[in-house]
Amino acid sequence: MRTPRFRIQAKNVFLTYPKCSIPKEHLLSFIQTLSLQSNPKFIKICRELHQNGEPHLHALIQFEGKITITNNRLFDCVHPSCSTSFHPNIQGAKSSSDVKSYLDKDGDTVEWGQFQIDGRSARGGQQSANDAYAKALNSGSKSEALNVIRELVPKDFVLQFHNLNSNLDRIFQEPPAPYVSPFPCSSFDQVPVEIEEWVADNVRDSAARPWRPNSIVIEGDSRTGKTIWARSLGPHNYLCGHLDLSPKVFNNAAWYNVIDDVDPHYLKHFKEFMGSQRDWQSNTKYGKPVQIKGGIPTIFLCNPGPTSSYKEFLAEEKQEALKAWALKNAIFITLTEPLYSGSNQSHSQTSQEASHPA
């Protein structure tokens, strides 16, 4: 009886080298140097120790196109430190995703190229999707989670990318980096008594602050130290020019908000901020509404002028009712002098308020 002729046609090839002590890096280099019908797109090598301690090597090779293998010695590899040659079992890989998952299970791997999603899996159905999403949640970061979903659930990656992107932003949300003031609060030695009293009563942690703190509006010329002073008081949200309440910028654990150089005519959520309101939502332009915990005071910083001053805005005839409300929820201070006296702050004050002229 004739021995069947060896022949494999496949776009993805799975190799197993039993009892093989070749370094996985050497095998990777060896495969890369082979002259093959189609160029490899991705190669992954895994070193696996069986229960008896013997090492095995597995390799997944993805090609640009389908190749035909008739030489069963094509992938025989010689150990770099001796003359021993190791012969692999050669198979076509029906699901490269499943093979890659198998190679990844022990973690002792090396790879080259970009893995090609094949969309096929021997483990079909809902459980496979659940496993994929569980792996994504355990990946540790948004980018890694998206890579897992792209690889294991490519249909969801394409059709649900917008929702996945938004949901993973929330799941792997990192709080904004804390601001470090260039000057301590104590260096501002010309702060009016009314402002100091407001700070003592309202800028406190959640356990000590009032249930509905008062806000404060501070109006004054540029380079009086308003911005740096306001940002030196403690953990805060800084909103300048426009409001970005996304989790990447806005921190619900902050002690207070600073709204700097925002025209009051176009200030979104005017009452929510000035009234220290709790548990409100803000619609975002391209995403889902964000939930704001609230209950913290806001420091409004502005310059004189019709497009900056809150006093001038509230003095408009059509804002009469809003003015009456605002006077019950905030105090209004006009600065005539800088908040500091020392010349040692002049350079940083100038550079800070040149960017934020409020």
Curated annotation (Swiss-Prot):
Known EC number(s)?
2.7.7.-, 3.1.21.-
- Which cofactors is this protein said to need? Mg(2+); Mn(2+)
Q: Which SUPFAM superfamilies match?
A: Origin of replication-binding domain, RBD-like
Q: Region Binding to RBR1: start and end of each range?
A: 142-152
| Manner of cofactor binding, per the entry note | Divalent metal cations, possibly Mg(2+) or Mn(2+).
Write out the GO cellular component annotations.
host cell nucleus
* Annotated active site: Y102
| Sequence motif RCR-2, location on chain | 56-58
Give the multimer and partner information: Homooligomer. Interacts with the replication enhancer protein (REn). Interacts with host retinoblastoma-related protein 1 (RBR1), and may thereby induce the transcription of host replicative enzymes even if the cell is not dividing anymore. Interacts with host PCNA. Interacts with host SCE1 protein.
Give the protein's biological function. Essential for the replication of viral ssDNA. The closed circular ssDNA genome is first converted to a superhelical dsDNA. Rep binds a specific region at the genome origin of replication. It introduces an endonucleolytic nick within the conserved sequence 5'-TAATATTAC-3' in the intergenic region of the genome present in all geminiviruses, thereby initiating the rolling circle replication (RCR). Following cleavage, binds covalently to the 5'-phosphate of DNA as a tyrosyl ester. The cleavage gives rise to a free 3'-OH that serves as a primer for the cellular DNA polymerase.
Q: Which family does it belong to?
A: Belongs to the geminiviridae Rep protein family.
Q: What is this protein called?
A: Replication-associated protein
Q: Which organism is it from?
A: African cassava mosaic virus (isolate West Kenyan 844) (ACMV)
